[in-house]
């Protein structure tokens, strides 16, 4: 047998036990990809004021061979501690996180790509003898199917005042705020296999 599959009695290509290919589905679907991460930290101060600032960027190009996927994340942190008076301490913490993910819907949280790949038989052909992709690789869903785009903006803020009116007597006041703005977009395309 010199072809990856043969037609059945209806003229359709065989793709399970009657096919003849030898496919490593993980290698067909995934590739090595680059990721980059950059960090910046600044801190300083004196006995009455201390500050810390950090920023981080992570970018990943994605590891799908078919159907583009990308991920970006930006994180910033800010901390400030001050003791302007003997009877008062001030602490401020702020954090901002931005995440963006763009990938085929078939690979999103409810997608079945990883589930399906681990159940594909090696003899299931990747392409038919005419050079067209077979339906088993889910390539049509990855390349022409639906997309999932999401971005998230998380902001955290914490403030604290510590009063020392008398020796060994502390009064603490805290405030915190967290906001999460999430944008999800999914476009659903019909895919024929």
Model regions and ranges:
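A beta-strand signature from Gram-negative outer-membrane beta-barrel systems
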Residues: 1, 35-37, 50
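Surface-exposed loop/interface segments of Gram-negative outer-membrane beta-barrel transport/assembly proteins
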Residues: 1-22, 52, 58, 62-156, ...
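Surface-exposed cleft-lining segments at the edges of enzyme active sites
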Residues: 25-27
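Short Gly/Pro-enriched turn/cap motifs at secondary-structure boundaries
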Residues: 29-33
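Outer-membrane beta-barrel channels and translocator barrels
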Residues: 35, 46-47, 83-87, 164-166
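Outer-membrane beta-barrel architecture
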Residues: 39-43, 79, 158-160
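A generic beta-sheet turn/junction motif
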Residues: 44-48, 57
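Short, Φ-rich (hydrophobic/aromatic) sequence segments
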Residues: 155-161, 165, 169
């Amino acid at each position: 047998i010199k072809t990856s599959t043969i037609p059945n009695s209806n003229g359709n290509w065989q793709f399970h036990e009657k096919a003849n290919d030898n496919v490593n589905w993980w290698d067909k679907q995934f590739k090595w990809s680059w990721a980059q991460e950059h960090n910046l930290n600044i801190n300083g101060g004196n006995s009455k004021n201390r500050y810390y600032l950090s920023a981080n960027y992570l970018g990943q190009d994605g590891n799908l061979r078919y159907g583009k996927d990308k991920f970006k994340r930006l994180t910033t942190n800010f901390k400030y501690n001050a003791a302007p008076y003997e009877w008062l301490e001030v602490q401020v913490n702020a954090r901002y996180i931005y995440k963006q993910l763009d990938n085929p819907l078939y690979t999103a949280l409810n997608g079945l790509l990883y589930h399906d790949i681990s159940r594909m038989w090696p003899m299931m052909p990747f392409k038919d003898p005419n050079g067209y992709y077979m339906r088993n690789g889910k390539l049509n869903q990855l390349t022409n199917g639906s997309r999932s785009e999401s971005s998230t903006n998380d902001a955290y803020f914490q403030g604290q005042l510590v009063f020392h009116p008398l020796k060994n007597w502390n009064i603490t006041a805290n405030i915190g705020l967290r906001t999460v703005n999430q944008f999800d977009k999914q476009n659903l395309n019909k895919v024929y296999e």
